[in-house]
A protein has these predicted regions:
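Active-site beta-strand->loop->alpha-helix modules in alpha/beta enzyme cores, enriched
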Residues: 1-97, 135-139, 153-159, 167, ...
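Acidic/polar loop patches that form or flank catalytic/metal-binding clefts of enzymes
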Residues: 24, 95-97, 102, 144-149
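Conserved beta-strand scaffold positions in the cores of enzyme catalytic domains, especially
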Residues: 26-28, 104-106, 122
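Residues at the C-termini of beta-strands that transition into short coil/loop
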Residues: 30-32, 108-110, 126
């Protein structure tokens, strides 16, 4: 494992500990495509899918969250999402019973929100929960550099994320729905 990988694992563990997530519930996949150590990662392969599938079979989750914001310049988020969805498709073809009680939710990153008409689940965030989300993001110090690939937005990642969550809550308020500090929106992925 690279130094970068060790640092990012430590940051992820710190964020999980901050949010009272037991470390025995944290899984690092070590996907083969990701371990190429380069900015341009290797292509996703069946080996990546098998790693994800093995974890899904072990955990049998009721909810899975995948990146729906696929404008990642390195393609990492898209490859991870593709590996998860391919593993789910293989499990579905195999008749996995656990999938009957599982929902797959797609989230967006800090740059864009789902269109209001496409949102299928919205989780309200109190001021304290929004602050906890910010603090969790800030635990990932090695990833705090700017990301200019989606325009000239100079705000930091956590600022964009908070502003996006607050804007979603404001939109729901304008529609006459309950008023919250912020809201995190999701779209459900439904395997064919």
């Amino acid at each position: 494992m690279t130094i970068k990988g060790l640092i990012r694992r430590g940051e992820a563990r710190t964020a999980c500990t901050y949010n009272d997530i037991p470390l025995d519930h944290v899984h690092f996949l070590d996907l083969p495509f990701y371990e190429s150590g380069k900015i341009e990662k290797l292509p996703m392969t069946e080996k990546d899918v098998e790693v994800v599938r093995a974890l899904l079979q072990k955990v049998q989750p009721h909810q899975i969250y995948v990146a729906g914001d696929l404008a990642d310049p390195h393609g990492t988020h898209k490859k991870c999402t593709d590996a998860v969805l391919a593993a789910i498709d293989e499990e579905k073809k195999a008749g996995a019973e656990w999938l009957k009680d599982c929902r797959i939710w797609m989230y967006r990153g800090a740059w864009a929100e789902w269109e209001i008409e496409n949102i299928e689940m919205c989780v309200p965030l109190s001021p304290e929960e929004l602050r906890a989300k910010r603090n969790s993001i800030l635990k990932h110090q090695s990833q705090m550099e700017s990301a200019p690939f989606l325009g000239n937005d100079e705000r930091l990642f956590w600022q964009r994320a908070e502003d996006r969550n607050r804007a979603t809550a404001s939109l729901y308020d304008q529609l006459g729905l309950a008023c919250y500090e912020a809201m995190e929106a999701f779209v459900e992925y439904k395997p064919l």
